[in-house]
Amino acid sequence: MKRASITLRAEHAEFTRLQAFADGFAHQCGLPDDERSRLLIILDELFTNAVTHGLWPYSAGGTIAVALGWRTGRLRITFVDDGQPFDPLAFRGPDLEEATEERGIGGLGIHIVRSLVHQARYRREGDRNHLHLVRRIGLPSREWPSGERPGGAGV
């Protein structure tokens, strides 16, 4: 299994480092461009939510740790932050059937992540949020293997 990790300051300016890290990992593992793009979308949504809603303005000097793992057909993403407790698996996403004007703002990023992964686990350990995601390469995102759909409602 190939593995790599990075620790970032919880600041928007660090996103370029995260992009370069993920892009390099994807190329090293030989992921096709569409899968590399999906990985970048997942990390963009998680990072932006953590920095914007979970850490700032509550915690100055927060950190975000990202670990990636690859074994043929399976991409693992671990995202850890020291922000406010937040379980995205328990978060009720937006009602996409509702008219745009009626729908509240927010929640689409979590919905996007849910649609791109096959397995997810969350836990709060100490003062940190731990989110573990698995994306199976070669299996369409919306086809959840029996018994593996997280929380009955996606990520």
Briefly describe each language-model feature range.
Residues 15, 19-22, 113:
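Heptad-repeat coiled-coil signal-transmission/dimerization helices
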Residues 20-44, 48, 102-104:
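Conserved short strand/loop->alpha-helix "switch" segment adjacent to the catalytic nucleotide/phosphoryl-transfer site
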Residues 17, 38-41, 74, 115:
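Alpha-helical macromolecular-interaction surfaces
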Residues 5-17:
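STAS-typified acidic loop motif
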